[in-house]
Design a protein with these regions (language model features):
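Short amphipathic alpha-helix that is part of the acyltransferase structural core
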Residues: 2-42
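An active-site-proximal beta-strand-loop segment
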Residues: 37-45, 53, 67-72
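Short hydrophobic/aromatic beta-strand or adjacent loop that forms the aromatic wall/cage
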Residues: 45, 195-200
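Glycine-rich phosphate/pyrophosphate-binding loop shared by adenosine-nucleotide-utilizing enzymes
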Residues: 15, 54-60, 81-84
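Conserved beta-hairpin
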Residues: 31, 44-64
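Hydrophobic helices that insert into or interface with lipid environments
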Residues: 171, 208-214
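Short, cationic low-complexity segments
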Residues: 213-229
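Acyl-donor binding region in acyl/amide transferases
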Residues: 21, 63-190
Length: 229
């Protein structure tokens, strides 16, 4: 195992999978082409390429939460710079078995060294993926329960409810961030869905775990149907 770059750490290699920072445009293009949402998240600012045998086979993008100030309601004393969300992840099937959890683990080791101000990482498994977060379980994230969010489906794409409720005078709407303008201009055709999201947290600084305001819960089983849990 090795950390690349001196004095600035730029990646992490576990001997099988390597991650290193890549240009935002490169990462965004891969996500748009391959991620199930086909949409980027503009608040992502850590863009990591995933390499197997020297070949770029995937991307992980970390950044702010949709509500950056929400961290303190999850872990007491959290400032915006103290936590990240895994906003987007895509790996090619040729990356191999267990590549997702390995890539996440490598990315966490990298972030811990490169961004020491980050104390915890949060991610959500989306019910649309039908797996309830088994990748995060394999990467030793802890599970903190589920909640239901409203999504809107338009022409085969899903949009978070926040994009339906944004003011038409807001910058996000005018710039069509997250497809807000597209969604609202076509709201009569949009289909409403209520979908569960499963919250996972990884504490990079174990001392911060005691500050968590949520109760850790047993992992949901990925093979259970939605009505069973």
């Amino acid at each position: 195992m090795s950390l690349w770059g001196k004095p600035k750490v730029i990646g992490y290699d576990n001997g099988i999978i390597a991650v290193k920072e890549i240009h935002r445009d490169t990462a965004n293009a891969i996500i748009i082409d391959n991620h199930y949402s086909h949409k980027i998240y503009n608040a992502s600012y850590i863009h990591l390429g995933v390499y197997v045998g020297g070949e770029l086979t995937g991307v992980l993008q970390y950044g702010s939460a949709m509500n950056p100030a929400s961290g303190a309601s999850v872990v007491s004393g959290t400032s915006i710079e103290n936590f990240l969300e895994l906003n987007r992840m895509w790996l090619d099937d040729k990356a191999g078995r267990n590549s997702e959890s390995q890539a996440i683990s490598c990315s966490i080791k990298y972030i811990k060294h490169r961004y020491p101000q980050v104390k915890w990482i949060q991610s959500f498994a989306d019910e649309r993926c039908h797996c309830f977060g088994i990748v995060y379980q394999a990467a030793s994230f802890k599970y903190y329960g589920e909640h239901t969010n409203v999504f809107w489906e338009l022409d085969g794409e899903f949009y978070h409810n926040i994009n339906m409720t944004l003011s038409t005078e807001s910058r996000r709407y005018k710039n069509n961030v997250g497809g807000a303008r597209t969604l609202q201009e076509n709201k009569e055709r949009a289909i409403k869905h209520e979908l569960r999201q499963f919250r996972y947290i990884k504490f990079l600084d174990k001392r911060w775990e005691s500050r968590c305001l949520l109760t850790e819960q047993p992992y949901p089983k990925h093979y259970m149907a939605a009505d069973d849990i």
